[in-house]
Amino acid sequence: MILLPQEIIRNKRDGKTLSRQEIDFFIKGITDNSVTEGQIAAFAMAVYFQDMNMDERVLLVSAMRDSGQVINWQSLNLNGPVVDKHSTGGVGDVTSLILGPMVAACGGYVPMISGRGLGHTGGTLDKLDAISGYKTTPDSLDHFRKIVKEVGVAIIGQTGDLAPADKRFYATRDITATVESIPLITASILSKKLAAGIDALVMDVKAGSGAFMPTFEQSEALANSIVGVANGAGCKTSALITNMDQVLASSAGNAVEVREAVRFLKGEVVNPRLHEVTMALCAEMLLLSGLAADIKEAQAKLQKVLDNGKAAEVFAKMVGALGGPADFIENQDNYLQKSAIVRPVYAQHSGIVQSMDTRALGMAVVNLGGGRHSASDSIDYAVGLSGILSLGESADSEKPLAMIHAQSEKQFSEAQRAIQSAIICGTDSLQAQTQVYRHIRLPDIS
């Protein structure tokens, strides 16, 4: 059977179901450059409009995963499961820095391959880059495997060896208005995650004003797709749909979020929302990977490693193993950049925080220099927001909406206006919000 890229595009354009051979051929062509940019764009648009069924999505993810190296952990004789978490992104979402060490301290191995900031959402790699000396690109995949075995967790960026088809595919989607396709989002996320050779995966799919997906229904559709496809590709996976109607942590930025993560791990300052979401994700990871028999046991194990300092110790070891300071956990302020200006922003009218345009707050951080408008932009790790009020908290002349970390008066003034517009105060008392909306497991997928 002779396969041609244009015929595969035609079949999908016309709403036909693609075969394994067609999908494998097309993804191989993306990897070896025998498929052109125009053909990738046409294929992406055909999928965008005609969708893919669950079988096609599984085949697409598997082909993209296998386009490069798939990490093998069996030769290391690990004495625990290999498990990971992925978030669709939000503002103040510092869970990865806390969750990885917690799960590792409970006996799991967490090879986390993370990304950089995208639009208004922060990136885990950018946060880690704020730590002096930390290398998000290890010397080799063998070095990465060695750190995971010895420490229990390592957080790095994608290497060229893992799912190379995704890099080219995504670059084309980014400039052809096909990023939003759920089958293609599913394939992009899972190809990289499954190439890490994990046994289990927990997805954190955000919903709300700061989420990647604009509606709850779309967040739910993405969660269902990822759970169904990942399990179909042989990786035990479940998802939590979590609240992104306000900033998750008390801070948003890079150094400011790292500082909050360290203080959380040390038990110094614990934001209740961040604690609830992190504990829920960690517990799901322990349950899915067999490290706990039930939710009560999982929560007890997790709280224990926070209380006895073991999770903080694992974080310190990871930072040291990847080139950061050996005493970072004790002396983080010596190694994290500070901005020239740290000053409060107050509400224009006193009241109770009613709502938050979380996306606008994320963009305020980007405009301070803490994120990128284009991929080539450099980041100022010192800037951001801290002490951000929660929904239902009172703001007045004594209690600011947030602290702005800026490098100039102009930056401060622009951020001040953005924050005052994004956080709405009124007179109504608010009930505490649910942070975890739904758990989605394989039996839930119709």
From Swiss-Prot:
Keyword vocabulary terms for this entry = Glycosyltransferase, Transferase
Give the EC number: 2.4.2.4
SUPFAM superfamilies xref list: Nucleoside phosphorylase/phosphoribosyltransferase catalytic domain, Nucleoside phosphorylase/phosphoribosyltransferase N-terminal domain, Pyrimidine nucleoside phosphorylase C-terminal domain
Pathway involvement?
Answer: Pyrimidine metabolism; dTMP biosynthesis via salvage pathway; dTMP from thymine: step 1/2
| A Gene Ontology term for the protein's cellular component | cytosol
What Gene Ontology terms for biological process does this UniProt record contain?
A: pyrimidine nucleobase metabolic process; thymidine metabolic process
**What GO molecular function annotations does the UniProt record carry, in alphabetical order?**
1,4-alpha-oligoglucan phosphorylase activity; thymidine phosphorylase activity
Q: A Pfam family for this UniProt protein?
A: Glycos_transf_3
HAMAP family for this protein: Thymid_phosp
Subunit and partners? Homodimer.
Q: What does this protein do?
A: The enzymes which catalyze the reversible phosphorolysis of pyrimidine nucleosides are involved in the degradation of these compounds and in their utilization as carbon and energy sources, or in the rescue of pyrimidine bases for nucleotide synthesis.
**Entry similarity comment:** Belongs to the thymidine/pyrimidine-nucleoside phosphorylase family.
- Its protein name is Thymidine phosphorylase
Q: Which organism is it from?
A: Psychromonas ingrahamii (strain DSM 17664 / CCUG 51855 / 37)
Whichever gene encodes this chain, its name is deoA
